[in-house]
């Protein structure tokens, strides 16, 4: 269709991201361009967004993650797919509850005073508030999400899926209730998942003790970082092949302070080389000890309460806080002569991500998923080339295998109110357990389990629960599952990716996604992880405010390769803004020269100049490179090809050369150049659109175009008619000649405005004819007073000389410079660089310097040596040309 000329406006003279991006997102939403259509004539392509937590605003990592997904889905939509990018958010159990409780505390109340129902109302209010924040940030980033299908992990549909999965796994014996060692937060009094435990290196102590052997003068030496747990010791373990302790296996130790008799057991878990080779076993307070205790049927003695205070099993220490108990017990053991050494030691200690409290390995009755059968099924699927998930980069598949091969049962219950309440009820009299999707009919005789499920339980179902499962007749489930790619960070392979895979295998009998594209972490410019404590975090909205979403997105998309971390540099974002500004100015010039030009006017069948043929051929190559690399998720490479084509070729060379036709008198040439400009700019904006959606839509709307939005325009395809290796070769030679002349002029400080004689000696007549045909460009960009092109040119005396493929270029210097003065200046410069070369080489030949100086200092001196040698060589060449 013809472009509406009445609505057409030229681009403003200055690129202002705020003005460009303002209102554009609403235009896309109004056009419903992001909504999946279910068109049976199109192949479906789907992605589910990793649901951000409704705990606060999105950080830079979210911006990176979602920019990748948006780039992929925009490209696929343009390639003709029926694209579903499904948005949603995660209720984030403990994280959100902690935030809501903190807000309640500020208002002078707490969840217990409110009660469960009122507290959940407050939590839902929080969710609505922060969901609105998140949506506004998605809008600022320009994300093409299908909001008609937005999901939340506590939606009724997803809650139904959670209950269905829980009940089915329970009925298969894969969910059970039992005692196990869990990560316990004494501050919030809840179990934590492994990902909610942050390990920090602290300066602690290693306490060495001697336990007496019953009926003997012998003792056995053990060591611990948590002496308060000795009150719950029920054995000492040694390796069965450790000759030092063979005679003690089966004997009894008297536990100091407590006086309890505990056995010395033999277990392969013990490392003979570590410490004394004997370890205290506390099955209720250590996961490894728990396993050893199971193997040897040891008693489990819990010595702490849920709040971290010591309980009745701690004897005289009952009521003390665990750390106060540690101090007191150390004092008592020293007095008894049991503790003989305290060693300062740096070690890793787990802290709650939410409360900061030191996490306690704690014996608790919880709900668990039995993992071995589920892991085996998932691993069997991964071993099948046709059924497996493709990890990108593939090295992360090994990480996945390592985790699944060594997996432990999954503790899924949490002592919280915000979340999916466990669908289990206990009979008030018989204590019978009932598990079902619906409450028992005689509900008055039952009490529902107070706990909720681990957040990861519901997010593990995300790829299929969001599409209507357990309704297997759901149209979306049939069409869009399994999804095509999951984009997420490599740091949650264990906690999310693996769980989605085994739950999908269990309930859908297939993988949840074809590929999983794993990116790294965003770090600051010095490579440090961004954190509140370091104060080095960057709010993506601040970056957008300063440079616009397009600049931030392009930096994020091109700044790293799959699986690698990304360092954030404000300077690099500024450089992408410069790129956007370059695109804007080039487009503005082009559009200004297309007044009255319509989509139907584009005609590429006329006589094409060398720059026309070259830019069309290079466009072909760029389309191929950008498409191929993007399909492999190599967005950095795709962006590099696009950047080089736009900046170095289209802007710096083609547009400048196009001015000869645009400002000329030949109307046919003018129309052809306009057509090439319009076509190349249109195709380039389409390729750039997934990376920089706002600016490309703005420019595309001003170009002669067809269709309502670049978002739903067709992705560029290679046109074999424009393949032209000869034109590319000819243009490369022409550009090389122009560059060499400009460089030579700069070396003798001769501005382009001053005309100079120029001689080009070619190696054959064919090349002479080629250059003669392009004489206009040589004269326009080299500004010669006289231009001779021939195979028989003699090299003049005292001339600047440069060589390109098939030709030599001479610029006679007679009349341009004072030779004697220039020779003297160059000799002084040569002496200067020679002196610098000698100085740096003397330094590098000093073995004392090379061996003792930091590597970075030595490398800097080597860099200087190379730089000085290059400058010395150039000055020598120029002197030889003048003498």
From Swiss-Prot:
The keyword ATP-binding applies. Residues 813-848 form a coiled coil. GO terms for molecular function: aminoacyl-tRNA deacylase activity; ATP binding; valine-tRNA ligase activity. InterPro entries: aa-tRNA-synth_I_CS (IPR001412), aa-tRNA-synth_Ia (IPR002300), Anticodon_Ia_Val (IPR033705), M/V/L/I-tRNA-synth_anticd-bd (IPR013155), Rossmann-like_a/b/a_fold (IPR014729), tRNA-bd_arm (IPR010978), tRNAsynth_Ia_anticodon-bd (IPR009080), Val-tRNA_synth_C_sf (IPR037118). It is found in: Cytoplasm. Signal peptide: none annotated. GO terms for biological process: valyl-tRNA aminoacylation. It holds the Pfam family Val_tRNA-synt_C. SUPFAM superfamilies: Anticodon-binding domain of a subclass of class I aminoacyl-tRNA synthetases, Nucleotidylyl transferase, tRNA-binding arm, ValRS/IleRS/LeuRS editing domain. Keywords: Aminoacyl-tRNA synthetase, ATP-binding, Coiled coil, Cytoplasm, Ligase, Nucleotide-binding, Protein biosynthesis. Belongs to the class-I aminoacyl-tRNA synthetase family. ValS type 1 subfamily. Monomer. This is Valine--tRNA ligase. It comes from Oceanobacillus iheyensis (strain DSM 14371 / CIP 107618 / JCM 11309 / KCTC 3954 / HTE831). The gene is valS.
């Amino acid at each position: 269709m013809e472009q509406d000329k009445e609505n057409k406006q030229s681009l403003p003279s200055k690129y202002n991201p705020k003005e460009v991006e303002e209102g554009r997102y609403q235009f896309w939403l109004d056009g419903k361009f992001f909504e999946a259509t279910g068109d049976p004539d199109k192949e479906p392509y789907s992605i589910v967004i990793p649901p951000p937590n409704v705990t606060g605003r999105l950080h830079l990592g979210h911006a990176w993650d979602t920019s990748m997904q948006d780039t992929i889905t925009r490209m696929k939509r343009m390639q003709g797919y029926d694209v579903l990018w499904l948005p949603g958010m995660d209720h984030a159990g403990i994280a959100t509850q902690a935030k809501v409780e903190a807000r309640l505390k500020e208002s002078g109340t707490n969840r217990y005073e409110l009660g469960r129902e009122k507290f959940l109302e407050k939590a839902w209010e929080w969710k609505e508030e922060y969901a609105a924040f998140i949506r506004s940030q998605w809008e600022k980033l320009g994300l093409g999400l299908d909001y008609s299908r937005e999901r939340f992990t506590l939606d009724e549909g997803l809650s139904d899926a959670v209950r269905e999965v829980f009940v089915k796994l329970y009925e298969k014996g894969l969910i059970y209730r039992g005692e196990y060692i869990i990560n316990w937060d004494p501050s919030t009094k809840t179990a934590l998942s492994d990902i909610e435990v942050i390990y920090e290196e602290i300066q602690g102590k290693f306490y060495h003790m001697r336990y007496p052997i019953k009926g003997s003068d012998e003792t056995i030496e053990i060591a611990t970082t948590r002496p308060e747990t000795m009150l719950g010791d029920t054995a000492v373990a040694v390796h069965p092949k450790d000759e030092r302790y063979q005679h003690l296996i089966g004997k009894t130790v008297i536990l100091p302070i407590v006086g309890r008799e505990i056995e010395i057991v033999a277990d392969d878990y013990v490392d003979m080389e570590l410490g004394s080779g004997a370890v205290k076993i506390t099955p209720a307070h250590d996961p490894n000890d728990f396993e050893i205790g199971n193997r040897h049927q040891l008693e489990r003695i819990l010595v702490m309460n849920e709040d971290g205070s010591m309980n009745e099993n701690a004897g005289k220490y009952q009521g003390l806080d665990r750390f106060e108990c540690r101090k007191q017990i150390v004092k008592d053991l020293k007095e008894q002569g049991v503790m003989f050494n305290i060693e300062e030691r740096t070690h890793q200690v787990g802290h709650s991500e939410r409360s900061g409290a030191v996490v306690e390995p704690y014996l608790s009755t919880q709900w668990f998923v039995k993992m071995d059968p589920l892991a085996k099924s998932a691993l069997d699927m991964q071993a099948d080339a046709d059924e497996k998930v493709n990890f990108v980069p593939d090295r992360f598949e090994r990480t996945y295998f390592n985790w699944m091969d060594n997996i432990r049962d999954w503790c899924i219950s949490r002592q919280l109110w915000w979340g999916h309440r466990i669908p289990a009820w206990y009979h008030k009299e018989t204590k019978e357990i009932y598990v079902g999707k619906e409450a028992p009919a005689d509900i008055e005789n039952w009490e529902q389990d107070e706990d909720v499920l681990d957040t990861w339980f519901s997010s593990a179902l995300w790829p299929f629960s969001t599409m209507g499962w357990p309704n297997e007749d759901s149209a979306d489930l049939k069409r869009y599952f399994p999804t095509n790619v999951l984009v997420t960070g490599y740091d949650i392979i264990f906690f999310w990716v693996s769980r989605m895979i085994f739950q999908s295998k269990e309930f859908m009998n297939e993988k949840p996604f074809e590929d999983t594209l794993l990116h790294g972490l965003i770090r600051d410019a010095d490579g440090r992880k961004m954190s509140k404590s370091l104060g080095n975090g960057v709010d993506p909205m601040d970056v957008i405010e300063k440079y616009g979403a397009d600049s931030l997105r392009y930096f994020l998309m091109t700044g790293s390769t799959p699986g690698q971390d990304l360092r954030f540099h404000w300077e690099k974002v500024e450089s992408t803004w410069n790129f956007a500004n370059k695109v804007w100015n080039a487009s503005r010039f082009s559009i200004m020269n297309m007044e009255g030009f319509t989509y139907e006017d584009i005609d590429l069948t006329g006589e094409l100049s060398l720059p026309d043929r070259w830019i069309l051929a290079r466009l072909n190559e760029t389309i191929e490179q950008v498409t191929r690399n993007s399909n492999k998720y190599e967005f950095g490479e795709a962006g590099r090809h696009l950047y080089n084509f736009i900046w170095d070729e289209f802007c710096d060379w083609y547009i400048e050369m196009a001015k000869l036709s645009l400002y000329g008198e030949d109307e046919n040439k003018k129309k052809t150049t306009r057509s090439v400009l319009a076509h190349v700019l249109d195709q380039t904006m389409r390729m750039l659109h997934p990376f920089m959606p706002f600016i490309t839509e703005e420019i595309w709307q001003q170009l002669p175009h067809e269709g309502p939005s670049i978002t739903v325009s067709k992705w560029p395809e290679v046109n074999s008619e424009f393949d032209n290796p000869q034109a590319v070769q000819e243009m490369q030679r022409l550009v090389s000649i122009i560059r060499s002349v400009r460089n030579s002029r700069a070396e003798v400080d001769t501005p382009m405005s001053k005309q100079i004689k120029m001689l080009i000696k070619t190696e054959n007549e064919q090349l002479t004819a080629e250059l003669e045909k392009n004489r206009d460009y040589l004269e326009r960009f080299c500004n010669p007073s006289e231009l001779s092109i021939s195979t028989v040119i003699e090299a003049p005396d005292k001339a600047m000389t440069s060589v390109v493929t098939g030709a030599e270029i001479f610029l006679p210097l007679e009349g341009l410079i004072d030779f004697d003065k220039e020779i003297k200046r160059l000799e002084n410069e040569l002496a200067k660089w020679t002196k610098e070369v000698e100085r740096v080489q003397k330094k590098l030949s000093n073995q004392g310097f090379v061996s003792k100086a930091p590597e970075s200092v030595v490398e800097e001196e080597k860099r200087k040596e190379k730089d000085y040698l290059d400058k010395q060589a150039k000055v020598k060449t120029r002197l030889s040309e003048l003498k």
